[in-house]
Curated annotation (Swiss-Prot):
Keyword Disulfide bond: no
Protein name (Swiss-Prot/TrEMBL): Glutamyl-tRNA(Gln) amidotransferase subunit E
E.C. designation(s): 6.3.5.-
GO biological process: glutaminyl-tRNAGln biosynthesis via transamidation; translation
Organism: Thermoplasma acidophilum (strain ATCC 25905 / DSM 1728 / JCM 9062 / NBRC 15155 / AMRC-C165)
Subunit: Heterodimer of GatD and GatE.
Enzyme class at the top of the EC tree: ligase
Pfam families (UniProt xref): GatB_N
Length: 603
């Protein structure tokens, strides 16, 4: 199978917001909120985009949190201002470093987006560079476009049918670099993303928040293009490509099985109200479904054993779709009896529906008013998969991917009328020439020469694109300790806590630790506490950061020895940690252990 892979790599810039003069960082919390309901509109040719149509069907409301780095432009109550010149110059500089042709005029377009992530219902985007390329270990990779666009609002939470967004991220300049499908495999994709990342980050104008770098992976095995949006970590690129390969291979196997039995039948799939069949059920999910609207079931002809059977997981495809409409109570016959349903209840359901041996049954808790819409959506999705048209937009979920929405098309683009065309003149070109991106090798060598860290640590820092974070941390702690924080301590804490802390907070903690004269062990303890609490101020007041004195350490050691524990030089540190959560210097603890042990031996 001919696999094609391409990337769209997005980098936020720290230049100031793109269409107003607000800063990219906020210094206070919520100022106010307002609500909107977005409605679909046709393109200039009169067509309606499939992705926009899908979002419209979800009929959601949106609430926006106003922050101190947002204004009337983000609220869509005032026209956009002239685009930030420094952001444009940075995009031109990056385009040149990627061997692109620079456009003569920058013309903004509107891209319809009605998922609530922009108050206007569209995103402004413009092409800056075209027809570039980068060299890689597996040959050249063509760069199709470099765009400068506004970032979307940041999703905070979903409450029922309402989505809450913050305006703090809306309007931040975003460089989007799109490659042609020249990437040969998942490891090559990681290499390409890194190579592009070094160039953008080394401009000095890239933002370094948790969500400042995002990759979209375009993947095809001949069954249509799948766009996996919002991959935040480089290593996750490898994971989602591997998963998507396996997913599509397994869907092919499921489809072949369904077709060998005669295929899917639209007439048979008719969601019927089966609430009365479960009037006395002990299943909490079914009871809850009946109370909230009703339980409906339908036959999926010839699909038995394809919904959840080893690697065949068509049921997940259905569940992902239904979940996107805010519906959670979905069950199917490949996992029944289960969920508190008895064998007798399941058999009664099958008899009522007239289930055949090769048929599957779908059971869903849903309000009656949404039944027909969900029924059509489910059937259309299954039919699309059976035709092996797998094109759609998906999102990362750990090492897997989940359905987000149909693939958008050209019908969502139309001209921007509020922003004049920008001529790329000598002034912009001169500004861009003062911004000098560097290669990976240059960045690594500079870290080794300037800070005296090992080449291995320098390569990790460069490859993970945390160079600026390292430099900022190294202002407050010794360079080797700064490298250790980013290469060992932070990755370990992220694995253990499943949390990602913004580098700005880590830098602030290091700054405060210098003021408080923390030693290495107090700082490392403070970092652990930061991953518990998120807030730097509350971390510094934690009693665990009060370092144990020599006498306190000796007292703990005496207690351990008197209890009869077999304390040795290899075990004493762990034994002390069992007795106290407070921080201590292991070297001092070893000295105290030897002193106490020797004194005991005298007697």
């Amino acid at each position: 199978m001919d696999t094609k892979i391409g990337l769209e790599v997005h980098f936020q810039l720290n230049t100031g917001k793109l269409f107003c003069r607000c800063p990219v960082e906020q210094s206070s919390g919520e100022l106010m909120r307002f609500s909107r309901k977005l409605h679909i509109s046709a393109s200039e040719l009169g067509n309606i985009d499939a992705a926009a149509s899908y979002e419209s069907m979800r009929s959601r409301s949106f609430q926006y949190v106003v922050t101190d780095n947002s204004c009337l432009v983000e609220m869509d109550e005032e026209p956009p201002k002239t685009p930030d010149e420094r952001a444009i110059a940075t995009a031109i500089s990056v385009s040149k470093a990627l061997n692109c042709d620079i456009v003569d005029h920058i013309t903004y377009m509107r891209k319809i987006v009605i998922d609530g992530s922009n108050t206007t219902g569209f995103q402004r985007t413009a092409i800056v560079g075209i027809n570039g390329h980068i060299e890689t270990s597996k040959g050249p990779v063509r760069i199709s476009t470099v765009c400068l666009e506004e970032d979307a609002a940041r999703k905070i939470e979903e409450i029922g049918n309402t989505v809450v967004y913050s305006l703090d991220r809306l309007g931040i300049p975003l460089i989007e670099i799109s490659t042609e499908p020249d990437i040969v495999d998942e490891d090559h994709a990681v290499e390409v993303a890194r190579s592009i990342g070094y160039i953008v980050i080394s401009t000095g104008n890239a933002r370094h928040a948790v969500d400042a770098v995002r990759q979209d992976v375009n993947f095809s095995m001949g069954y249509g293009r799948v766009e996996i949006k919002g991959v935040s970590k480089l290593t996750q690129i490898r994971d989602v490509i591997r998963y998507e390969k396996e997913r599509q291979e397994n869907l092919r196997a499921a489809v072949d099985l369904i077709k060998s039995r005669g295929g899917l039948d639209r007439v048979s799939f008719n969601l019927k109200d089966v609430s009365d069949l479960f009037a006395g059920t002990k299943s909490k999910i079914i009871r809850s479904g009946i109370e909230s609207g009703g339980v409906y079931a339908g036959i999926l002809k010839n699909m038995a054993g394809t919904l959840k059977n080893g690697k065949l997981r068509m049921g997940k495809e259905i569940a992902d779709l239904v979940r996107s409409y805010g519906i959670k109570g979905v069950m199917h016959s490949d996992e029944l009896p289960g969920y508190g349903l008895t064998q007798d209840e399941v058999e009664a359901l099958y008899r009522y529906l007239g289930k055949g041996d090769n048929d599957a049954v779908l059971l869903i808790a849903i309000n009656q008013s949404r039944v027909k819409m969900i029924e059509n959506s489910i059937f259309d999705r299954i039919q699309k998969i059976i035709s092996m048209d797998l094109s759609e937009t998906r999102g990362p979920a750990g090492e897997e991917t989940v359905f987000l929405r149909p693939m958008p098309g050209k019908d969502r683009m139309y001209p921007e009328t509020d922003i004049p065309v920008i001529k790329v003149d000598s002034k912009l070109m001169e500004m861009s020439s003062s911004i000098k991106p560097r290669t990976y090798a240059e960045v690594v060598q500079d870290l080794v020469d300037r800070y005296g860290i090992s080449k291995q640590n320098a390569e990790y820092i460069a490859s993970e694109m945390v160079v600026d974070a390292f430099r900022n941390i190294a202002e407050f702690v010794e360079a080797r300790e700064a490298a250790r924080i980013l290469t060992q301590i932070v990755p370990d804490l992220e694995r253990r806590t499943k949390k990602i802390i913004d580098h700005d907070r880590i830098i602030e903690l290091c700054r405060r630790s210098k003021d408080l004269h923390f030693d290495r062990y107090q700082l490392e303890m403070a970092l652990e506490i930061l991953y518990e609490r998120d807030d730097v101020a509350s971390v510094l007041g934690d009693s665990r950061l009060k370092e144990l004195s020599r006498e306190e350490i000796k007292s703990i050691i005496r207690e351990i020895l008197s209890s009869g524990r077999n304390a040795t030089q290899n075990s004493i540190i762990a034994l002390i940690k069992e007795k106290t959560e407070r921080v201590f210097d292991p070297r001092v603890a070893m000295e105290c252990f030897n002193e106490v042990k020797n004194k005991n031996n005298v007697f």
